[in-house]
């Protein structure tokens, strides 16, 4: 279901609780909402009012991917970036990495399975932005 975006700082600044397999409907709402937005590349669940650690992003082929409980384990190639956000006004200057390794859970057959994956460049920046949202960091 497509949800309205939330810009309430009280919601966005609240660290997200760990997600479970029972949160699959939240993940689906996140994907539906992301796909409905023009020029959007990623969303975190708190941006649709759900304080669960779930993020979704679109790859270069516009295919949606969902990460439950994402955590950046380490990064390489630090750089300064200027980012905008769908639920915040203005541009924020942030520190990012060109390459990151992320631990996350993936929903497989109704169960969360632990995964690790490397992300580079644009996808790495998106994931870092979404992980900041999960921590309640306002960008």
Regions found by a protein language model. Give the residues of each.
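Positively charged
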Residues: 1-139
